[in-house]
Amino acid sequence: MKKMKKVFALGLGVLMSLCLLSAGAGAAERPLAITYVKSPLNIPSILEKRLGLLEAEFGPLGYSVSHPEITSGAQQSQAMAAGSVQVANCIGGTSLLIAAAQGLDIRIAGIYSRSPRSFCLVVKDPAIRSVADLEGKKVAGPKGTVLHQLLLAGLKREGMEASRVEHIEMGIPAAVAALMSGSIDGALAAGPLALKALEGGARVLFNGEGLVEGTIVIGVSGAALRERDDLAKRMIDVHRRALAYAEEHPEETVKIVGEETGLSTEQVLEMEKLYDFDPTVRSEDIAELERTMHFLVDEGLATRFVDPASLLVR
């Protein structure tokens, strides 16, 4: 009888251990998909992935972190709507606001970056010396984006109506290629692709300075926030840790970023001057996002006005 009790107790212990392991495995399998966008020069994301900072933050909480490479803001929003992405770790303010206006339950955890000078309109024809020379010309670039907003703001500043320029919908790589081949007159570009155009003989007609801030944000799913209300805060904490690493290890950071982006040391050092990665949401950021929201409504890209301040995770 005692032997049977021992066997029973042993069996019960094994069963309980298996149950605990099963429960632990189940918790560890909770997915947390955080988009990975390394270009044009997203230093925080590159360091977060390479150094395993997100895994270190969320792994102990029972999350299995993945890094889907979805670079399009619209596609990040679609993935979040489908439930396959919980954090859009680098999404344009334009894309997030369009998605929010369409009813997506998405919130702003903080600012990812500001980089007005990295967004620009590049031209190659020597005859195009000013915005006035763009009349009747073809300019290519993605619509419903910061670059689209930049084009309209640049034209408006010089008193030119948007209808006097032919804006062709085109991705940045295709737009730069079309400019270099001579099939269009101007390309809306940013980051390494703008640099590539300049190295190929193009020049900047104007950039976002004084026109748009190029605000990129960290978007989090409302559903994910309800599951874990400190998700946004933890994302910002990791972002700050990546920035601290970059400050403490500048040479290693440049090396890592160069390996991830294919940029030379000189290119990384030149481009990083254009970015402000401070995640703190300032009053100027809210004002910029409000201007962006008005732009989207005026252009028919958003069906309703959404107050950006209402999307902030407090």
Regions found by a protein language model. Give the residues of each.
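A local structural motif
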Residues: 28-33, 55-69, 84-86, 157-169, ...
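Short loop->beta-strand "edge-of-pocket" segments that line small-molecule binding or catalytic clefts
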Residues: 32-38, 132-144, 241-243
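Ligand-binding cleft/hinge of the Venus flytrap
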Residues: 47-63, 148-166, 198-199, 255
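Extracytoplasmic "Venus flytrap"
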Residues: 31-50, 282
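Pocket-flanking alpha-helical
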Residues: 44-48, 68-105, 117-131, 147-148, ...
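Pocket-lining segment of extracytoplasmic ligand-binding domains
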Residues: 94, 164-168, 173-257
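Flexible hinge/capping segments at coil-to-helix
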Residues: 123-138, 226-230
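Secondary-structure end/capping motifs
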Residues: 227-301
